[in-house]
């Protein structure tokens, strides 16, 4: 794993400027927000209308899917219509499998996005094919031959390009040599940029997406390191692919994108949420709001110099996760008077995820609560203590500073845990502390705390700031002080962040695409129905993908996949294998549930 090698004071990574239509991206320009249409690109009226709604939502760049020549020709009319309306928003064509479409559409759009996993090479079909050194070298020559014409055309026309690597759709050749690894993702990107460099074309943006924030963050960090080592300062487009719906999708996006933004990486961003494209923009705005703070901090020392990153990784592995509450990465919730007064013990237990009748805990029940000391000894708290740890405020120091003198304070050293208040430069200060102490013989249990009133802002802020540390294995848990947010929602934010950071698995995980012009069914509606019937299957990963073009690859490490194969038809997958094909849509959901039963993972809700 690549631990953040960037400075304690966040400075944007230097990237050269790339012109995309009428705007520029790069470190000298503001970070741009991007989204993608869900209408069929061939439906010019509908696509133009949706792009207009994106412009109204303050989207900076719009992307459309281009499956073939018909969609490429439609882009000419879409761009003309937008310009006639006075809307000069850059238009991006998304290409998979069809280089001819890329060549055709480059005449009409401002940027072409290609996927190295399927532009020239075959996508990985898990065939077991072996590539000799000669096979591999021949494939690189073929790549240069097939890719160079597009590079030369984009250079001649002044059009930009995105080399968009996706973890779930690496080519068969890359998978055979490097496996499903960060190295494979980076090599895949570098193979293509070398062709661009040789032809003197540098209007290129990179992306290294995955549906797993941990993988995504590591891939971007490694690519940035490798590019900078070569003196190549290409801009980065950040995104967690197929992040999903609602709060889960927001949290997953914030953990991945937010972490990198606080480190100074990223020149454009997109939150790939299942649903209406305009819903992605407020999440992007909130992410930029919460991470821009880190760009304005005073300069401090750099404990994360590249040459020290390996020793930090090794040190972080030595952290002994033993805690007073008997669980790794605990969740604590701060209770206020209004949580305890005017309610019953039974009702409070239910809100905290505990069945008051039999004491059975939901997977998202917190390890404990922190209460005002005056409520100790009350009947409601005594009942609560039978099911979880209860601490009062004075037992748990809250720190707003992180200097060495504080860490030698007897109250801090003797406390069951210490909650570090998340106020910038919180992320950098905690990393600096662990770096200096080398994570050895650490007597203080650090739990990260946050107090906010607004549910939306709390979700983005907590996922960003806590996720950035939890991804690297730092800290022992989180404590949330969100007095105006319902307790079940507080639990959802806390455990969603832990799961997205890859440190606890407490619920069913869904990989669902945001939809595009290739989508073959109502993604939000179908995804919601599947979620409602499977959300009790803790630990299972289910992918709901709109089409067969990207679906089988982008569902990555899902256990089961529900993928649109053609209009009105669904294919079902177990891992990467299609086990049931062309199922009528009206039968497909029940077939999925039957498949779960056949594989022994189904259980009835309790």
UniProtKB/Swiss-Prot annotation:
Q: What does this protein do?
A: Converts 2C-methyl-D-erythritol 2,4-cyclodiphosphate (ME-2,4cPP) into 1-hydroxy-2-methyl-2-(E)-butenyl 4-diphosphate.
Gene Ontology molecular-function annotations: 4 iron, 4 sulfur cluster binding; 4-hydroxy-3-methylbut-2-en-1-yl diphosphate synthase activity (ferredoxin); 4-hydroxy-3-methylbut-2-enyl-diphosphate synthase activity (flavodoxin); iron ion binding
Bilayer-crossing regions: none
> In which pathway is this protein known to take part?
Isoprenoid biosynthesis; isopentenyl diphosphate biosynthesis via DXP pathway; isopentenyl diphosphate from 1-deoxy-D-xylulose 5-phosphate: step 5/6
Q: Which family does it belong to?
A: Belongs to the IspG family.
Q: EC?
A: 1.17.7.3
Encoding gene per record = ispG
Sites binding [4Fe-4S] cluster sit at 513, 516, 547, 554
This protein's species is Chlamydia felis (strain Fe/C-56) (Chlamydophila felis)
Q: Which NCBIfam families match?
A: ispG_gcpE (TIGR00612), PRK00694.1 (NF001912)
The protein here is known as: 4-hydroxy-3-methylbut-2-en-1-yl diphosphate synthase (flavodoxin)
Instruction: Name what cofactor the protein needs.
Output: [4Fe-4S] cluster
What InterPro entries does the record tag this protein with? Dihydropteroate_synth-like_sf (IPR011005), IspG_atypical (IPR017178), IspG_bac-typ (IPR004588), NO2/SO3_Rdtase_4Fe4S_sf (IPR045854)
Q: Which reaction does it catalyse?
A: (2E)-4-hydroxy-3-methylbut-2-enyl diphosphate + oxidized [flavodoxin] + H2O + 2 H(+) = 2-C-methyl-D-erythritol 2,4-cyclic diphosphate + reduced [flavodoxin]
Q: Keywords for this entry?
A: 4Fe-4S, Iron, Iron-sulfur, Isoprene biosynthesis, Metal-binding, Oxidoreductase
Q: How is the cofactor bound?
A: Binds 1 [4Fe-4S] cluster.
């Amino acid at each position: 794993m690549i631990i953040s090698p960037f400075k304690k004071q966040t400075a944007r990574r230097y990237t050269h400027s790339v012109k995309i239509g009428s705007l520029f991206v790069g470190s000298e320009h503001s970070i741009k927000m991007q989204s993608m249409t869900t209408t069929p690109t061939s439906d010019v009226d509908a696509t133009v209308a949706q792009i207009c709604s994106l412009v109204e939502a303050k989207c900076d760049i719009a992307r459309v899917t281009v499956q073939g020549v018909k969609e490429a020709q439609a882009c000419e009319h879409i761009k003309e219509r937008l310009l006639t309306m006075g809307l000069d928003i850059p238009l991006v064509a998304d290409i998979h499998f069809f280089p001819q479409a890329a060549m055709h559409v480059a005449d009409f759009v401002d940027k072409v996005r290609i996927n190295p996993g399927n532009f020239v090479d075959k996508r990985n079909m898990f065939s077991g094919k072996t590539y000799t050194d000669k096979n591999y070298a021949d494939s690189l020559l073929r790549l240069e031959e097939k890719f160079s014409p597009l590079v030369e055309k984009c250079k001649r026309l002044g059009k930009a390009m995105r080399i968009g690597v996706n973890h779930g759709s690496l080519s068969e050749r890359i998978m055979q040599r490097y496996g499903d690894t960060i190295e494979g993702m980076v090599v895949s990107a570098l193979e293509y940029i070398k062709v661009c460099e040789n032809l003197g074309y540098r209007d290129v943006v990179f992306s290294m997406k995955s549906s797993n924030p941990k993988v995504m963050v590591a891939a971007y960090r490694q690519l940035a390191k490798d590019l900078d080592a070569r003196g190549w300062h290409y801009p980065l487009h950040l995104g967690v692919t197929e992040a999903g719906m609602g709060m889960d999708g927001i949290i997953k996006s914030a953990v991945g994108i937010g972490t990198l933004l606080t480190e100074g990486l990223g020149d454009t961003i997109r939150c790939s949420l299942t649903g209406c494209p305009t819903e992605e923009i407020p999440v992007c705005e909130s992410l930029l709001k919460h991470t821009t703070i880190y760009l304005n901090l005073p300069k401090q020392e750099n404990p994360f110099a590249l040459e020290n990153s390996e020793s930090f990784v090794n040190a972080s592995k030595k952290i002994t996760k033993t805690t007073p509450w008997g669980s790794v990465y605990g969740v604590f919730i701060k209770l206020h008077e209004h949580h305890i007064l005017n309610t019953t013990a039974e009702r409070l237990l239910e809100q905290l995820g505990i069945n008051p009748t039999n004491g059975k805990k939901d997977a998202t029940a917190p390890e404990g609560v922190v209460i005002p000391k005056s409520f100790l000894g009350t009947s409601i708290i005594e009942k609560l203590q039978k099911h979880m740890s209860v601490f009062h405020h004075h037992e748990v120091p809250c720190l707003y500073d992180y200097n060495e003198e504080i860490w030698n304070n007897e109250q801090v050293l003797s406390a069951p845990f210490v909650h570090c208040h998340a106020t910038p430069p919180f992320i950098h200060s905690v990393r600096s502390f662990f770096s200096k102490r080398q994570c050895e013989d650490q007597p203080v249990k650090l739990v990260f705390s946050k107090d906010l009133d607004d549910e939306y802002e709390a979700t983005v802020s907590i996922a960003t700031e806590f996720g950035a540390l939890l991804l690297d294995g730092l800290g022992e848990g989180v404590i949330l002080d969100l007095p105006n947010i319902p307790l079940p929602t507080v639990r959802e934010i806390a455990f969603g962040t832990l799961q997205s950071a890859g440190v606890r698995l407490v619920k069913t995980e869904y990989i669902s695409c945001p939809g595009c012009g290739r989508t073959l069914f109502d993604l939000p509606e179908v995804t919601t129905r599947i979620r409602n019937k499977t959300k009790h299957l803790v630990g299972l990963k289910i992918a709901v993908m709109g089409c067969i073009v990207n679906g089988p690859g982008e569902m990555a490490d899902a256990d089961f996949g529900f993928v649109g194969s053609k209009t009105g038809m669904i294919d079902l997958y177990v891992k990467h294998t299609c086990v049931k094909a062309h199922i009528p849509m009206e039968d497909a959901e029940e077939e999925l549930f039957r498949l779960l039963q056949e594989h022994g993972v189904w259980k009835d809700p309790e």
